[in-house]
Amino acid sequence: MEPTSSILGEGCPEVLHDFDQQGVDFNEIRRLYQFGEYIGGSEAASVLGCNPYTSALTLWMQKSGREDIPDISDKPAVRWGNLLEPIVLSETAEILGVHIEKPNFMYLHPLYPFMTANFDGVTEDGRLVEVKTTDSYKIKSMMEAGQIPPQWMAQIHHYACFRLPEWHSMAGEPFKGFVLSVKTHMQKDPYVFDEDIDWVYCEDLIKKEHEFCLMVKNGTPPQPDGSDSSSESVRLLPIGEGEMEATDEIRSHHQAAKDAARDKTTAEKAYKFHKNYIHALMSEKKISKIRGCAYTQTTSRLNQSLLKKRLAEHNLSHLIEECKEESPPFLKLV
């Protein structure tokens, strides 16, 4: 499949923010676009369900203001990644024998205004460059086997849906391919992948991102999966007070969860998937109990952040009791 205007739109992407301008802070701007109906490259994998840390449900909860967005800008891995990025770009340019430009802009897609992009680099011959740094043994093994992790493929193809920007000598043309450069060791060259763009993948990705943004707009949560991320987020969905009888579909998930629970070491994700399905359905129906199947239960917990704040303000230990809050409901299978 060749790139089409239904994927790329017409013309160069619009510059939303120029991070070289004084007073324009990348982290502050990025946080703004983490809310509402926008999808950035690093969020594409969550939409597709291949992000190992953030599920589609969690991303939906965060974008709709139902769940806090963790600030990872000060995490060591993120800081080191930012520091090493220009070094890895330089190494990659030397390995490929081409000049790589680092555009310091946030772009908006001309046809799909929910898609934003911030490119790590663009080669002089029109290839998209993405840089990663990691010490993950699993990813190192994939690099050695010539495999690209699915979450990175999603991010790369999100960016590939944009045309080359206005400052490039080939402005307005589709990207000619992509380069993924992965640094896993300070004393070794990065793994460099020089690949073609899968335009069918891009087409499917746009469709799924559009559907996801409509879910954010309409307040409709995506189906939870069996990830830890979904298991935490599903507990934050509102639960009502009513009851209902179990349908055949609910009984099927209920039995599958119980079967998986007998051997959680090998079926933990399956167990969470079926349990999360029931929990999300109960939220949708605004009930707290499915007779003979499941019910919710709440407990009190200590909000440590609030406790620290109160103690710092008043230096009064008895305020501990004021810092207790009701936890999100636990789902109990019967």
Regions found by a protein language model. Give the residues of each.
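Accessory terminal regions of nucleic-acid processing enzymes
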Residues: 1-334
